[in-house]
């Protein structure tokens, strides 16, 4: 959010200095090469992963995809747009050539608008997915009637509409301007940068609201919902016997990992409270045990990933906004200069690793993803459909939408 120079400019009118020195810009060659390699890797992996995720969802549209497909498509499009627009512009104008800004005033405003739009769309989609998952796990009966694909589509559309509105101010406060003037008082063309156009006070208010709405509140909501989901999963497993009798209506602890098992547990619990008796036998399913363990780990990993990737980015924005002009010493400039590139790299990493989270959350999506990879790699295996009565999906598949029973799809 600063300038096309990756640190606050210190323009000097001394004509005896080089333009680098007058604008306060100096990026070492080793840093340019290093961050170019990192950006190229992130761009390649992230663009391929998000494009393939969107491909999987669209191909599976009439088959196995459930509610998760809308969230996956939303996140994939946001990540793909951010990487395709953000990384090339940043490499050219923020890493290699800090000035002059060559994309014009509209390009400056559009770049920051798209950047902010994708950030909002990502966090709102993650929060919406966490809310659906929490409801599906904690209130499965209600979730069956409420969490339809049609309503999920409206939820995703609403999140993008909100993102458009929240990102629009960025196109107003950013713009192109010249940092230096010639001896005749005319703007110096070579000093053209993409930077903030509003006062420091207005910028402080904007950044505070932006950090709160685009990071703190969505992350807090996601952490809370995922915490409730994890607690409910663990509580259910502690309440249910680990074994069940053949022919008995008593669900085993392992059977809770499917939606059918979760619903039967509710019926069984009511019967048991009214005096029903159960007898137990040994029952094992190692794969489902591991599925539950993985589901709990993934819920926690989602929050941790966004904290690691986004917290430094927003901390750096606050630093730019609140450090007074007279406090920018040379060591602080140098720190900010490279901190800028590190935080933006982490920000783009979050878009690149998002497809990995899809694969970790849903075993059904993972199978579709691997089939698509195999097909694109030349094995030409078609994306096969599962039979009408597949193996019971894991609870995380049910909660996220893949593996929905046919009657719940609309």
UniProtKB/Swiss-Prot annotation:
GO cellular component, one term: plasma membrane
Domain of life of the source: Eukaryota
Swiss-Prot/TrEMBL GO biological process terms: cell surface receptor signaling pathway; neuropeptide signaling pathway; phospholipase C-activating G protein-coupled receptor signaling pathway; regulation of membrane potential; sensory perception
Annotated membrane topology: Multi-pass membrane protein
GO molecular function (one): G protein-coupled neurotensin receptor activity
Topological domains annotated Cytoplasmic: 56-64, 132-154, 238-297, 359-410
Bilayer-spanning residue ranges: 33-55, 65-87, 110-131, 155-176, 218-237, 298-318, 338-358
The protein's name: Neurotensin receptor type 2
Primary localization class, coarse: membrane
Lipidation (S-palmitoyl cysteine): 377
Tissue expression from the record: Expressed in prostate (at protein level).
Location of this chain's protein in the cell: Cell membrane
Pfam families (alphabetical): 7tm_1
Disulfide links within the chain: 108-194
Chain segments carrying region Disordered: 381-410
Phylogenetic lineage: Eukaryota, Metazoa, Chordata, Craniata, Vertebrata
Segments on the Extracellular side according to the record's topology features: 1-32, 88-109, 177-217, 319-337
Function: Receptor for the tridecapeptide neurotensin. It is associated with G proteins that activate a phosphatidylinositol-calcium second messenger system.
InterPro entries: GPCR_Rhodpsn, GPCR_Rhodpsn_7TM, NT2_rcpt, NT_rcpt
Record key words, sorted: Cell membrane, Disulfide bond, G-protein coupled receptor, Lipoprotein, Membrane, Palmitate, Receptor, Transducer, Transmembrane, Transmembrane helix
Family, per entry: Belongs to the G-protein coupled receptor 1 family. Neurotensin receptor subfamily. NTSR2 sub-subfamily.
């Amino acid at each position: 959010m600063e300038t096309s120079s990756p640190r606050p400019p210190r323009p000097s009118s001394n004509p005896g200095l080089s333009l680098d020195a007058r604008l306060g810009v100096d990026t070492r060659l080793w840093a340019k090469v290093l961050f170019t390699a990192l950006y190229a890797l992130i761009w390649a992996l992230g663009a391929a992963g998000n494009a393939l995720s969107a491909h999987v969802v669209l191909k599976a549209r009439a088959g196995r995809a459930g509610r998760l497909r809308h969230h996956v498509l939303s996140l994939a499009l946001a990540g793909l747009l951010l990487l395709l627009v953000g990384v090339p512009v940043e490499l050219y104008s923020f890493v290699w050539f800090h000035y002059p800004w060559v994309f014009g005033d509209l390009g400056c405003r559009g770049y920051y608008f798209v950047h902010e739009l994708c950030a909002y769309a990502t966090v709102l989609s993650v929060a919406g997915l966490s809310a659906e998952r929490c409801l599906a796990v904690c209130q499965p009966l209600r979730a069956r009637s409420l969490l339809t694909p049609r309503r999920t589509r409206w939820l995703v559309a609403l999140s993008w509409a909100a993102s458009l509105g929240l990102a629009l101010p960025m196109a107003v406060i950013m713009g192109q301007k010249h940092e230096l003037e010639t001896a005749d008082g005319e703007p110096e063309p070579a000093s053209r940068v993409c930077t903030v156009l509003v006062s420091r006070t207005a910028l402080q208010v904007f950044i505070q609201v932006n950090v709160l709405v685009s990071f703190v509140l969505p992350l807090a909501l996601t952490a809370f919902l995922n915490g409730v989901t994890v607690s409910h999963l663990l509580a259910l497993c502690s309440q249910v016997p680990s074994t069940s009798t053949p022919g008995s209506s008593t669900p085993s602890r392992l059977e809770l990992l499917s939606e059918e098992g979760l619903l039967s547990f509710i019926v069984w619990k009511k019967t048991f409270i009214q005096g029903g008796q159960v007898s137990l036998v040994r029952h094992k399913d190692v794969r489902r045990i591991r599925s539950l363990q993985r589901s709990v780990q993934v819920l926690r990993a989602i929050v941790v990933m966004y904290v690691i990737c986004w917290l430094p980015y927003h901390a750096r924005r606050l630093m730019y906004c609140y450090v007074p002009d007279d406090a920018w010493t040379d060591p602080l400039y140098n720190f900010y200069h490279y901190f800028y590139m590190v935080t933006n790299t982490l920000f783009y990493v979050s878009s690149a690793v998002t497809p990995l989270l899809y694969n970790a959350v849903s075993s059904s999506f993972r199978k579709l993803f691997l089939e698509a990879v195999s097909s694109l790699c030349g094995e030409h295996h078609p994306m096969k459909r599962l039979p009408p009565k597949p193996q019971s999906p894991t609870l995380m598949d049910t909660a996220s939408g893949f593996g929905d029973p046919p009657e719940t799809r609309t």
